[in-house]
């Protein structure tokens, strides 16, 4: 039985780098894993930079609707603030 988490309970496959008999294979597997993680990090970095390079229009579909309702939203916020202030005075 192989003690590593990947093979626990199932036994090792034909080629397993976890045993003490093949330390070179374990080292090679670690190098392959490190290279894969590095490639994954590079790809994620490339995608993030590509996303940042493209300018996006913030909320393009909601902007006209927000402009039309902005005075009502401001008035509603003031009414809510007044109500909160009055409720605070009553409870104190």
From Swiss-Prot:
One Pfam family cited in the UniProt record for this chain: Harakiri
Keywords, sorted A to Z: Apoptosis, Membrane, Mitochondrion, Transmembrane, Transmembrane helix
Subunit structure: Interacts with BCL2 and BCL2L1. Interacts with C1QBP.
Principal subcellular localisation of the protein: membrane
Signal sequence segment: none
GO-annotated biological processes: apoptotic process; cellular response to potassium ion starvation; positive regulation of apoptotic process; positive regulation of neuron apoptotic process; positive regulation of protein-containing complex assembly; positive regulation of release of cytochrome c from mitochondria
Annotated GO CC locations: membrane; mitochondrion
The organism of origin for this protein: Mus musculus
BH3, short sequence motif: residues: 33-47
Topology in the lipid bilayer: Single-pass membrane protein
Reported function: Promotes apoptosis.
Description of its domains: The BH3 motif is required for the induction of cell death.
Encoding gene (name): Hrk
The protein's name in its UniProt record: Activator of apoptosis harakiri
Subcellular location: Membrane; Mitochondrion
Residues annotated as transmembrane: 70-88
